[in-house]
Amino acid sequence: MDQRRTVLLADASEEFRSLLREEIEKTGEFSVDIARDGNEVLKKVEERTPDLLVMDAMLAGLDGISVLRQLQKQENGPMTILTSGFVSGRMLMEASELGVAYFLPKPFETENLLDKMRGLFLQAPKETLPSLKTRVTSVIHEIGVPAHIK
């Protein structure tokens, strides 16, 4: 059974995708699939649910931020590292709000990306918070409101 982590690499540049895929797979730690545009990212995430998405912010079709908005609607979307040759404070803030784990400005060293990828998989899983309904029900019970009144 293959124990490698699955990575979806999304970038508009075929040359960049190819070179980065080769460097990442060379480690033997990751299996890499590629996407050329935002719509393909959404399709592949839905079909394969990768462990990690490494995505450029500037994609054809849907840009990276729009893809992140769509992925946020899913329950178990992949962890995400966002890359871009263009950096703005607004984009960084929005990416952070949408749950991006890391932002890497281009150009970057492949080893830097690999360090970030490895670090994400070594972190302890985040504690999941109870749903709003569960929390409201708990509070209602604590204050003694009958269960049929909500």
Label every model-predicted segment:
Residues 60:
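The feature encodes the CheY-like receiver
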Residues 56-57, 84, 106:
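Active-site residues of response regulator receiver
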Residues 37, 63-66:
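Acidic catalytic/metal-coordinating carboxylates
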Residues 90, 108-117:
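C-terminal output helix
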